[in-house]
């Protein structure tokens, strides 16, 4: 019960962040590996930087409303920011058993084929960062990794408390149960254009990356988490598992760290360091 109440509060806080809205770029589409239609923003010119948003959000909420995408584009990069499968303008309401394994990571492989250009960097926040890890693992893309809002629990397949809370909220919403968590996730879906069925599928298709595989990563990696963010484990501990990875501490919780000005500043500094 406490976990569900906390989830409702977190989702409500995230909804308040929409007050910082800035206009997002128009969206384009591509056909993914299984012909699903995925929508994405494309803004700026320069080396490609893919931005992957968090669970139950969309690219606009995560990257454009806080102004992060615009700042990266202004720094001389081509920002590609998809609405991930089952979210926002990329609806996918198949039942969980019909979601392909690693679907969101495989969508990014199809995206790079569509663009005809490998990314200079892939950056993700929360679920987007988990997907960025999987994208690198499956493709062995040589671009940089910027991973926000995740820690060492992404390597622990048994650490499912957070997923369980989200799943319970979604199932309450689908069943019409009037719980605080269900109300919060329904409000979130309405605000971002998502669906509960899409969210449920995304949770079901999520795959962890065990520590022995993290140890094989050989690209520059930056880990960023808020000083009060332990939602996905320890950021410094994750950095210690990836060879050569660096850690930057932000101010805030899992949700509020995305509006810390230090986030885009650290991302741009990392991007520039490789040019």
Task: Please describe what each predicted stretch is.
Residues 56-68:
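The serine-hydrolase catalytic nucleophile loop
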Residues 72-91:
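Conserved alpha/beta-hydrolase
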Residues 102-119:
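Conserved acidic catalytic loop of the alpha/beta-hydrolase fold
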Residues 118-155:
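Conserved hydrolase catalytic core segment
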Residues 187-210:
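Hydrophobic, aromatic-rich cap/lid helix
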Residues 217, 223-225:
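Short beta-strand/loop motif that positions the catalytic acidic residue
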Residues 227-252:
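Conserved loop-alpha-helix segment in the C-terminal half of the alpha/beta-hydrolase fold
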Residues 250-275:
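Catalytic active-site module of serine/aspartate enzymes centered on a nucleophile-bearing elbow/loop
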């Amino acid at each position: 019960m406490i976990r569900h109440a906390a989830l409702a509060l977190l989702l409500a806080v995230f909804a308040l962040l929409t007050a910082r809205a800035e206009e997002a770029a128009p969206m384009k589409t591509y056909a993914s590996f299984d012909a699903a239609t995925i929508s994405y923003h494309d803004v700026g010119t320069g080396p490609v930087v893919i931005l992957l948003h968090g669970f139950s959000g969309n690219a606009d909420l995560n990257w454009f409303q806080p102004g992060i995408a615009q700042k990266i584009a202004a720094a001389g990069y081509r920002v590609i920011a998809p609405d991930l499968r089952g979210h926002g303008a990329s609806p996918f309401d198949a039942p969980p058993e019909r979601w392909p394994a690693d679907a969101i990571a495989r969508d990014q492989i199809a995206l790079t084929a569509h663009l005809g250009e490998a990314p200079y960097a892939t950056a993700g926040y929360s679920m987007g960062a988990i997907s960025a890890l999987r994208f690198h693992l499956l493709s062995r893309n040589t671009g940089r990794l910027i991973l926000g809002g995740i820690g060492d629990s992404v390597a622990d397949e048994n650490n499912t408390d957070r997923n369980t809370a989200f799943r319970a909220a979604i199932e309450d919403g689908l069943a019409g149960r009037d719980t605080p968590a269900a109300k919060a996730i329904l409000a979130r879906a309405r605000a971002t254009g998502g669906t509960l069925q899409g969210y449920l599928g995304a949770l079901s298709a999520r795959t962890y990356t065990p520590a022995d595989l993290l140890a094989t990563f050989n690209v520059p990696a930056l880990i960023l988490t808020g000083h009060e963010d332990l939602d996905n484990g320890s950021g410094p501990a994750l950095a210690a598992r990836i060879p050569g990875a660096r850690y930057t501490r932000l101010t805030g919780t899992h949700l509020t760290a995305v509006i810390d000005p230090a986030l885009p500043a650290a991302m741009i500094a990392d991007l520039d360091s490789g040019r």
